[in-house]
Each structure stands twice: as structure tokens, then as C-alpha cells.
């Protein structure tokens, strides 16, 4: 969700932080965000291998994934950075399927089940990010645009997740409230 939000606010964020001369980097940041949105799922699936004592599988997967990661770099050498970044997005999806395939055998939680469980969160996140991105089309100062996008995104996220009562949201909310009460 955060990576999609970052992709949605990339243009005003880059202009504010490093200036208009860096506008060509907006698309690069957005592509990198798409590549990184699966990172939590990668981490969980790899942690399962470690917890279950399958460092052998972990090592094999890392070797395979690093080998696959060479291809986007080669693409980048010949076709440019944007193609390389899109290659890294593809590599991220391939790596997720590899990681989840092997962890699924260990915990009886298939890739399809994982996707089915995270699909509602991704759907809501994509929708909210799309609404946030629409604000980047307005011809207003980036100093108004960025805070507006962030406020709209946070408000929508809170309202939609409160309404849908998704288990993932409820768990994050419970943990957040618990941390606040400890202080």
C-alpha cells in the first residue's frame, strides 16, 4: 500500500525534494515502487524457509534469483534504465512465485491462497493510489498538491479499511493501538 502511495505522489515529491530538473526520474521511482510492492511477501516466504530449517532451499532460491536478476541488468545495458527497471519488476514477480512455491510445501499455504488473501488489500491500495494520482493532474502548486494527495490517500485508506474491516487492517490497527497504550 505504501509503495503504491509513493508511486502516486512521485512527481510532486521529487519536485519538492530535489527540483524540477529531476522530473525524468519520476517514472523511475514509480517503476521501482511497483518492483518493491511485493517485498513483504518475499520476506515472509523466505523467513518461513529459515524458520523451518531449510537454509538449503533458501540458498538455492537466492542463487536462482540472483542469476535471473542479471537479465534486467543486461537489458539495461542495451536498452536503457527504464527497460532495466521494468525487468526488475518482472524479476520481482518471478521471485515471489519461486519463494511462495517452496514455502507453500512447508506450511500448506499455496501461492494461490496467498494471492487470494492479499488481493483485497492490493485492490483497495491500487484504487486509493489511483485517486491520489488523479490529483497530480491538477494544475496547482506542488506544495499544495503533495499534502492534498497524502491527506486524501490517508483519509480514503482509513475510511475504506474501517468500512471493509479487512483482517489485515484490523491486525495493524490492534498492534498500533497496543503500541500507543504502552507509552
Q: Residue locations for each model-derived region?
A:
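Short helix-capping/hinge motifs at transmembrane helix termini and TM-loop junctions
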Residues: 9-14, 18-22, 53-54, 76-81, ...
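Short helix-terminus and kink motifs of transmembrane alpha helices
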Residues: 11-15, 43, 47, 166-170
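A generic structured-segment signal
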Residues: 15, 94, 101-106, 114-118
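Hydrophobic membrane-spanning alpha-helices of multi-pass integral membrane proteins
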Residues: 64-68, 118-133
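Alpha-helical transmembrane segments of multi-pass membrane transport and lipid-handling proteins
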Residues: 1-39, 70-71, 75, 126-129, ...
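Short runs within selected transmembrane alpha-helices of multi-pass transporters and secretion channels
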Residues: 4, 27-73, 77-105, 149-154
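Short, amphipathic, aromatic/basic-enriched membrane-interface segments that mark the entry/exit
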Residues: 51-61, 111-119, 142-143
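Membrane-proximal transmembrane or re-entrant/amphipathic helices at the cytosolic face
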Residues: 104, 109-111, 118, 131-183
